[in-house]
Design a protein with these regions (language model features):
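N-terminal low-complexity, intrinsically disordered segments
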Residues: 1-7
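Extracytosolic low-complexity repeat regions of secreted or lipid-anchored proteins
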Residues: 12-88
Length: 88
């Protein structure tokens, strides 16, 4: 697709930052969350109705990522760990 390289790089960065968050103390978790927020800011929205080749993330997936970030910011790693197991 048009954004295949970007999507792959974002996926790798996402797994790295979430793993770093999961393995860290409070200071490392804060650093990891800041890094992951930068990755999230780069995630393009897939235009509704566009062909798959256009690339990007669905609005639903981006909302779930935002919810995972908020959960992690509260110190709850449940969804982070589920994401790591399922995707990384």
């Amino acid at each position: 697709g048009q954004q295949a390289g970007l999507m792959h790089a974002l996926f790798q960065a996402e797994c790295a930052w979430l793993r770093y968050w999961d393995e860290g103390d409070a200071a490392q978790k804060a650093e990891a969350l800041a890094g992951y927020r930068q990755v999230r800011a780069l995630m393009p929205l897939h235009p509704e109705g566009a062909l798959e080749d256009v690339g990007g993330y669905s609005a639903d997936l981006l909302r779930s990522i935002d919810a995972m970030i908020a959960e992690a910011a509260r110190g709850d790693g449940t969804t982070v760990r589920q994401h790591l197991l399922a995707n990384c």
